[in-house]
Amino acid sequence: MEDYKQRIKNKLNVVPMEPGCYLMKDRNDQVIYVGKAKKLRNRLRSYFTGAHDAKTTRLVGEIRRFEFIVTSSETESLLLELNLIKQYQPRYNILLKDDKSYPFIKITKEKYPRLLVTRTVKQGTGKYFGPYPNAYSAQETKKLLDRIYPYRKCDKMPDKLCLYYHIGQCLGPCVYDVDLSKYAQMTKEITDFLNGEDKTILKSLEERMLTASESLDFERAKEYRDLIQHIQNLTNKQKIMSSDKTIRDVFGYSVDKGWMCIQVFFIRQGNMIKRDTTMIPLQQTEEEEFYTFIGQFYSLNQHILPKEVHVPRNLDKEMIQSVVDTKIVQPARGPKKDMVDLAAHNAKVSLNNKFELISRDESRTIKAIEELGTQMGIQTPIRIEAFDNSNIQGVDPVSAMVTFVDGKPDKKNYRKYKIKTVKGPDDYKSMREVVRRRYSRVLNEGLPLPDLIIVDGGKGHMNGVIDVLQNELGLDIPVAGLQKNDKHQTSELLYGASAEIVPLKKNSQAFYLLHRIQDEVHRFAITFHRQTRQKTGLKSILDDIDGIGSKRKTLLLRSFGSIKKMKEATLEDFKNIGIPENVAKNLHEQLHK
């Protein structure tokens, strides 16, 4: 089976049984189809099993991968689907040309306004609410409001009272001088309802129902009860679509197994038009990692600052405000908090998928190590040991080793190391120390030697390890280096005297195994480093300076990167990032003692 088919098969197994939308992509990573589903896993599986009509068969033949977005209801899925189709215009979807395809409810701009359902938006002619997922939904909402509020119904003002007046669904402004303030109050209540605020209208109906019941008018009371139930069924709060047109980005995140996934929903004109997903290994606390991420997210000119940024309430608003120059909102309740929660839920789903896919791929690892050995020109590496270092500015440096046997993690043979002989952040010397300690003990205790050693790094790391093995310990074990790209993803395998790139296909089983090994050793090292920091406390020269607490220390390290850079900074540099003048003076003096 071709690799992309196997990847799709693996991913199908970890898709949740929840409502949502999915995006099918071709070999060029272009979205070719957008769909929705009540249960994502069932719908997605249906594409890759059984017979299909000619159009679907052509579609499936072009699919190379898929993505999905979890929503909270089927209605949300439908609304999101409409937006995604408009955004990507996939060729296998029936394209919707413009906003005229969507039904809206309109309150006309007249002395005595009317309620209309329309697909045409004309600015300056009234207030528009929507879009609604279909005409039926919009018409049902209008009918409900017509029954509750005696709003004008006629296109043109007639010269006599019509049927609507006689059945209590119009105040008759065509004949009577209707109090404009009463009409304005109705308009306000209707507007609130169409904006998603249904408490006022429900309270009013409950009061009417109670009054009718006390008057023994049970038929009227039943009518009000039915209206209340109808509203509760109709007003399934929409998180994906909002009548609030504020331009905003919504952030949510999830953390697991040393990794953090951050999801960003881009909300424009009340619609979620795009999603960004980022996976990063945790090197700090989750809060500190988020502050660094969001600062870079907008500072790298990849994303335009919106009017509002919505973030979880556990984060420090002032810290985010120091790096993001726009309004920061931490919703406590309602649809806005629901949206933040939905972003976090999608982040959790993405993390779970990552780990589930890794776990399911273990059964195919023998093929991976055979392929790896062939491409490197060595014997099949049954036992692989991989090393990675972890520290922050040289503080509490540690290293970790993971062992893979037959391409599977052998966790009982994982090892942790605290760096003992190296002062400061020196990755090369730290790696030499750990390798020396590890294989001196292996030789002394007669433990099994690995068939391949992998270091997280490049030629410098490899040469240091080879020197220790050959010239100090008399061992001849293949040593390879794994490098990452700027997105912190496994990029290439280096091997040989000149650290040449091993020609592995990025979609091969061997490359995927290397990616997993690098992720695992990094996770293990980061987790150990975090545990070490929690025990000893992150100690630095900044801890002894009055006025510098944990927040300001994080701000300084993020702004300058190192103590060395802080020593080169001027008093004005400190003040420019928000450090008070008296604290800045004290900091400047202490750094130059």
UniProtKB/Swiss-Prot annotation:
PROSITE patterns: GIY_YIG, UVR, UVRC
Keyword Hydrolase: no
Primary localization class, coarse: cytoplasm
GO terms of molecular function: DNA binding; excinuclease ABC activity
Compartments, record wording: Cytoplasm
GO BP field: nucleotide-excision repair; SOS response
InterPro entries for this protein: GIY-YIG_endonuc (IPR000305), GIY-YIG_endonuc_sf (IPR035901), GIY-YIG_UvrC_Cho (IPR047296), RuvA_2-like (IPR010994), UVR_dom (IPR001943), UVR_dom_sf (IPR036876), UvrABC_protein_C (IPR050066), UvrC (IPR004791)
Keyword DNA repair set for record: yes
Domain GIY-YIG: 17-94
Organism superkingdom: Bacteria
Alphabetic keyword roster: Cytoplasm, DNA damage, DNA excision, DNA repair, Excision nuclease, SOS response
Pfam families the UniProt entry points to: GIY-YIG, UVR, UvrC_RNaseH, UvrC_RNaseH_dom
Coiled coil, from the record: none
Boundaries of every UVR domain copy: 199-234
Family, per entry: Belongs to the UvrC family.
Summary of the function given for this chain in its UniProt record: The UvrABC repair system catalyzes the recognition and processing of DNA lesions. UvrC both incises the 5' and 3' sides of the lesion. The N-terminal half is responsible for the 3' incision and the C-terminal half is responsible for the 5' incision.
Assembly description: Interacts with UvrB in an incision complex.
PANTHER family: UVRABC SYSTEM PROTEIN C (PTHR30562:SF1), UVRC/OXIDOREDUCTASE (PTHR30562)
The protein's name in its UniProt record: UvrABC system protein C
Organism taxonomic ancestry: Bacteria, Bacillati, Bacillota, Bacilli, Bacillales
Designated gene of the protein: uvrC
